[in-house]
């Protein structure tokens, strides 16, 4: 999969449409106005933006934010993101309240080389998610060169991630996309062994293809989170009131059998009547009483998983081990984050992806001790299972 990169493109004097992933959490500032709550994804796009500006291109940034349902929503405007970006790059960042159209084209054509503009939320137009040809064409009309740097949205065939590239002569990978693909290709296609994968989260159904793929590639696949209870139930364990995908029991059984011993499941659990901060939490081994639900992996499982991770040469993690945003049920996820960092310190190549996992890394102070922190959740899973990413497939072959 060799695609054009920024190194292959002369952007001087060119209008460069950069699809970034500025789908960031918003907060409220002291004066009541919206502001950026976490700028990790914005910072991740800076190398590409800086390259275009430093090489005399006009940077035209497009992104989605949230789920406005194909119509304008003032609460999901990117205006405050433009302000935040300006402080990061120490440049004026223009903002357009429109995404496409004659007015936007006129503003862009009047921009000087080395300047930047952020256009309004692409999802304010229903044509974005529908990958509408008219909307994709309107985006293409704004630029001479297209660059996709939004790995977090690369698994979606939307107008700004895939459709627009069909109407551009030059469509290239951004720096972030290059880094993501390089790191994840190493994990998927040429991992050093032993390889350990850790998957958590709530649903088996969200990760079917990834579980299948990793159970073939990895030496050990450690399962946590609510989806572990679906597996435990099909193996005959009592899981109490734990969340189970009843319509996926047969699928989970097939996956477990096909994995031929690769999958490891929790042996003890932190349980309570509800996932609440003031709930009475306790640890049970084996079966879970009927009135209780499993909400985190227990200490014995933490020790076992940590040992596996520390023995790995390659380790990849996606998904929390429990309801980590509630303190009594955060220990398992925090322990995995710390074990990942320790394994990296010992020489392992580590990859962490998915919003919850990355958030846990940050909370534990381990985010700078990981080989590669991915900006993708769904895109990471799609890539690891070997499925094509529309946002990459649409780009110009090198």
From Swiss-Prot:
Compartmental location: Cytoplasm
GO function term, MF aspect, one: ADP binding
Pathway: Carbohydrate degradation; glycolysis; pyruvate from D-glyceraldehyde 3-phosphate: step 2/5
Intrachain S-S bonds: none
Record SUPFAM superfamilies: Phosphoglycerate kinase (SSF53748)
UniProt keywords, alphabetically: ATP-binding, Cytoplasm, Glycolysis, Kinase, Nucleotide-binding, Transferase
Binding site for ATP: 207, 294, 325, 354-357
UniProt-listed Gene3D superfamilies: Phosphoglycerate kinase, N-terminal domain (3.40.50.1260)
Domain of life of the source: Bacteria
GO biological process, any: gluconeogenesis
Catalyzed reaction equations: (2R)-3-phosphoglycerate + ATP = (2R)-3-phospho-glyceroyl phosphate + ADP
Pfam families: PGK
EC number(s) given by UniProt: 2.7.2.3
Binding site for substrate: 21-23, 41, 64-67, 123, 156
GO cellular-component term (any): cytosol
Coiled coil: none
Main subcellular localisation: cytoplasm
Transmembrane segments: none
Main enzyme class: transferase
Family affiliation: Belongs to the phosphoglycerate kinase family.
HAMAP family the UniProt entry points to: Phosphoglyc_kinase
Subunit structure: Monomer.
Name listed for the protein in its UniProt record: Phosphoglycerate kinase
Gene: pgk
């Amino acid at each position: 999969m060799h695609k054009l990169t920024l190194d292959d493109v002369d952007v001087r004097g060119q209008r460069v449409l950069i699809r970034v992933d500025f789908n960031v959490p918003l907060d409220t500032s002291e004066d009541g106005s919206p502001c950026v709550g976490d700028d990790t994804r914005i910072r991740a796009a800076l190398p590409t933006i800086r390259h275009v500006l430093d090489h005399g291109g006009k940077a035209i940034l497009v992104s989605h934010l949230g789920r406005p349902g194909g119509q304008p929503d003032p609460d999901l405007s990117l205006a405050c993101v433009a302000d935040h970006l300006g402080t990061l790059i120490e440049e004026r960042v223009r903002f357009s309240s429109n995404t496409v159209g004659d007015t936007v084209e006129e503003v862009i054509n009047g921009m000087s080389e080395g300047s930047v503009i952020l256009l309004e939320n692409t999802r304010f137009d229903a044509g974005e998610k529908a990958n509408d040809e008219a909307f994709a064409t309107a985006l293409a009309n704004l630029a001479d060169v297209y660059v996709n740097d939004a790995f977090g949205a690369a698994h979606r065939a939307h107008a700004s991630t895939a459709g627009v590239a069909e109407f551009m002569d030059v469509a290239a990978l951004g720096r972030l996309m290059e880094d993501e693909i390089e790191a994840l290709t190493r994990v998927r296609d040429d991992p050093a062994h032993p390889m350990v994968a850790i998957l958590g989260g709530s649903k088996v159904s969200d990760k079917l293809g990834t579980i299948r793929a990793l159970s073939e590639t990895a030496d050990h696949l450690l399962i946590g989170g609510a989806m572990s209870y679906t597996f435990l139930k099909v193996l005959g364990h009592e899981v109490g009131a734990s969340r189970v995908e009843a319509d996926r029991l047969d699928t989970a059984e097939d996956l477990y059998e096909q994995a031929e011993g690769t999958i490891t499941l929790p042996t003890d659990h932190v349980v309570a009547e509800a996932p609440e901060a003031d709930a009475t939490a306790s640890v049970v081994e084996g079966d879970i009483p009927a009135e209780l639900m499993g909400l985190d992996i227990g200490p014995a499982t933490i020790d076992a998983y940590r040992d596996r991770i520390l023995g790995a040469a390659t380790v990849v993690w996606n998904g929390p081990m429990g309801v980590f945003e509630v303190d009594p049920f955060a220990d398992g996820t925090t322990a995995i984050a710390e074990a990942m960092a320790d394994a990296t310190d010992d020489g392992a190549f580590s990859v962490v992806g998915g919003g919850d996992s990355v958030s846990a890394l940050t909370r534990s102070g381990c985010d700078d001790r990981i080989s590669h922190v991915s900006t993708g959740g769904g895109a990471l899973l799609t890539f690891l299972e070997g499925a094509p990413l529309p946002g990459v497939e649409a780009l110009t072959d090198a």
